[in-house]
Amino acid sequence: MRAVLELTRRRARNARFARARAVVGARARAADAQELRDDSKGGSSVDKATSTAAEARETAHTLEGFREALRHGPGFDDFVRGDVAYSVPAPKSLKDKTTRKPAWLKREVPGGERYTEIKSKLRELKLATVCEEAKCPNLGECWGGGDGKTATATIMIMGDTCTRGCRFCAVKTAKAPPPLDKDEPANVSKAIAAWGLDYVVLTSVDRDDIEDQGAGHFRETVQRLKASCDVLVEALTPDFRGEKHLVELVATSGLDVFAHNVETVPELQRDVRDRRANWDQSIEVLKHAKKSGAKITKTSIMLGLGETHEQVVNALKLLREADVDVVTFGQYMRPTKKHLAVVEYVTPEAFKRYQEIAEEMGFLYVASGAMVRSSYKAGEFFLANVIKQRKAKEAAAAN
């Protein structure tokens, strides 16, 4: 008799628990249906306020459902005895959400003869590119050399493993990466000479594990390039922990453009970058490079990380005060779910407005668009013309 009563109680508890789960499921499905309706009306452009309100309602429903399940569901003893098999898949609306990309961010899958040729040569010479390591969305366009333009690739020297861990970056990290490849400067110059490029971007990982943080290696690579072929060189450098003699070592190597990225507005530096990097340090790097003789300095800012319009405008003012010549704006794209989430996808109209503001401030060149990156062939084409014109004027003045 006691066993029959116990069995009846268990069945009653299980029935109540099933009803509670049904309530949670029904509410989740209703939230999913609402989300689909929103998407059909232009959900990808729903503003932050609407999105936040929907998430708040969903959270309230979820908490209420869980409380009901706890009140009426099986007890701990039921789970211990194995009377209840509890395995319920998470409703779609409760899973980790990824902000949906708008249409203007779509790109074709990379391919083509030129793309294959560059990739093959890189593998042969054991060279890395930031295009691949950072999962750049423009890889196919730049390597493929579309629209009759020269194909470009940004070579990443000093290995493919960084000693820092910025929260936006997909490059591998380690406290002590493999040693530098002494043959790399020669291999880089060999590859560039074979491609016949007239503008090349060199960038690197951070190497805090090396005494000079790789500044000497960077300098040698630039000098070998300049000696082996007629090429304009842009160096996109680390901050070298703000050590000015190391910045100067690279700035006086013979490069044509000294680039160092501030990445985001001052207010978001601690959230976005490695703790060893900061706005003031990066500004000092750019200032000292110009003082050391770099004729053109350049930086880049990612948008979509939660920055405000006022913060972006203020950042531009500070960059002009530091005598920075070139600035680029691009949309932050989350490499994996382990990285910072995208707060918003900035519209093409907003990118255009930032470009206008920067140009009014007197920057030599501004590239602003969702798919623009610090190393992007449209900007390189413009800078190549600027540099050639300056050299022609200098030669004419000398005569």
Curated annotation (Swiss-Prot):
Residues 145-364 form the Radical SAM core domain. [4Fe-4S] cluster 2 binds at C162, C166, C169. Gene3D superfamilies: Aldolase class I (3.20.20.70). Binds 2 [4Fe-4S] clusters per subunit. One cluster is coordinated with 3 cysteines and an exchangeable S-adenosyl-L-methionine. It comes from the Eukaryota. Residues 31-58 are annotated as: Disordered. GO terms for molecular function: 4 iron, 4 sulfur cluster binding; lipoate synthase activity; metal ion binding. It is found in: Mitochondrion. Residues 31-41 have a biased composition (Basic and acidic residues). Residues 1-30 form a transit peptide. It catalyses: [[Fe-S] cluster scaffold protein carrying a second [4Fe-4S](2+) cluster] + N(6)-octanoyl-L-lysyl-[protein] + 2 oxidized [2Fe-2S]-[ferredoxin] + 2 S-adenosyl-L-methionine + 4 H(+) = [[Fe-S] cluster scaffold protein] + N(6)-[(R)-dihydrolipoyl]-L-lysyl-[protein] + 4 Fe(3+) + 2 hydrogen sulfide + 2 5'-deoxyadenosine + 2 L-methionine + 2 reduced [2Fe-2S]-[ferredoxin]. Its cofactor is [4Fe-4S] cluster. HAMAP family: Lipoyl_synth, Lipoyl_synth_plantM. Belongs to the radical SAM superfamily. Lipoyl synthase family. This is Lipoyl synthase, mitochondrial. It comes from Ostreococcus lucimarinus (strain CCE9901). The gene is LIP1.
